[in-house]
Amino acid sequence: MKKTITHTLLLFPILAMGIQAQEKQSSPNLIFIMADQWRGDALGCLGKEAVKTPHLDQLASEGVNFTNAVSSYPVSSPARGMLMTGMYPVHSKVTGNCNSATAPYGVELPESARCWSDVLKDQGYELGYIGKWHLDSPYQPYIETSNNKGKIAWNEWCPKERRHGFSHWIAYGTYDYHLKPMYWDTDASRDEFYFVDQWGPEYETDRAIDYIANRDNKLRDAGKPFALVVSMNPPHTGYELVPDKYKEIYRDVDVETVCNSPIIAPKGTKMGDFYRKSVLDYYACMTGVDEQVGRIIRQLKEQGLFENTIVGFTSDHGDSMGMHEHIGKNIYYEEAMRIPMMISWPEKIAPRRDSTLMIAFADLYPSLLSLMGFKEQIPAEVQTFDLSASILSLE
């Protein structure tokens, strides 16, 4: 009898560990897909621009599509800093783009910041980051990439201690040569970057699919939930650096039919000609990114993970592209500030909902953590808003 009791007592910790593992596995996975410089109106399902995005249209129909989402500071690094910290730039310390001009002022994501990824790491999540990071400032001697050879250096490696819980890492700082992108892998040192003869979003999706499928059972612990960020650079400039198969989709579009707006300057003007030269390639980039989103979702379904995975798609900011006589972002017109934002979670989020709620890019920090069951773990210093109830259609 004593022996039986002893054996039973010894089993209790093992059983408890098993139950705990099951509880962790029941937590939702997260796939967060982010583009760069994608205007909020540029989705096929909205019918406002001549862009084709069938996979994103489908994703929008499977969850909630926020049609008034905004980037509070429509510049890459500050927006990304707000997303990661849930704090506005004066508190996140990312007050401008991370480059050699801002580096002397300490403009980069602090190692001490408590990011949403740090919270998930502490809750037992496996974390992966693939693509553009742009939250570390370059330091001398600058790495040998072409965008570090001008007056301002842009590109920098992110060492492990600054990755905020992401243990699987295939990323770069900022590098806009989309047809021959460069990366550092997880264990690479600063000088061990490599270039790929493949369109960036396609390569990043290949690697994301490997992570989701957990190729060779080596990329993550299959017994734990995971969160994966796929940060694609297009449709950021250069717009023209996109595979021909996507350009071909827009070959027969009369560009003047997409320039019928009073905020687009006339043909023959500097800004008007820039828009006409760029817009169809911009759409081609979006259609290409859309195809990669479809591949990621297909892999989730093939692995039986889709139902309990939160899938989010958004952008750090929009793009003026010559509208309002302005090229680029960093301007408070809708074309620069408004962004796409959609969230799907088949187990919890009702489908086919368009929401006019004005949600900010940075609100995703507390909203996603709360949605995933970690409301109590949101740091007190987070300044943005938990809108998870609106995502779940509870208010």
Task: Identify the residue ranges that each predicted region occupies.
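Formylglycine-dependent sulfatase
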Residues: 2, 19-395
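Bacterial N-terminal signal peptides
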Residues: 7-16
